[in-house]
Amino acid sequence: KKAFDRARNDATYGWDGSPITTARLSAELWAQIKDQDWSLVSDVAFVSRWPLRLWSFDQHYQFIGGAGGFGEGYGAPAAVGAALANRKYGRLSVNIQGDGDMMYAPGVFWTAAHHHIPLLTVMHNNRAYQQEVMHIQRMADRHNRGITRANIGTTLQNPNIDYSKLVQSMGVYGEGPISAVSY
């Protein structure tokens, strides 16, 4: 109980910031799914493990766990596969999808549409292969080279990718981007 209370308090830092924090993304998503029969079918490492800190996991199937395939485009195909398994139970499959990871295999959303695989995907779009950006920044700093060029070949901008249009072109409902929440 104390850990959940502390996590909920920690999640409030930067709550109204833009872009939306991964804590708020996770908290807002939890508020929408908590009364459903749901399964988190994505890893949590790239969203600072907020779902594990804020959500209540009380069924064995509610989290498929991490893959270890970081940076290799594992997320979206794994989510679609898990959603396929959940389909026969009528379970809501939830995927918090990183943008860089998705760009390895975006065609998997065509597969989901073609085979009528229900999946709620929320894109965490930081416009970068962020794990790689941070690694390059650490290495540049370690070798006293400065971090100003860490974005070369690691960012997904100019042009920015419109993920809602990308998935719409494959037959999937897409909406966004959402850069701020207002009620």
Q: Which ranges hold each PLM region?
A:
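Thiamine diphosphate
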Residues: 50-183
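Active-site diphosphate/adenylate-binding microenvironment
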Residues: 2-85
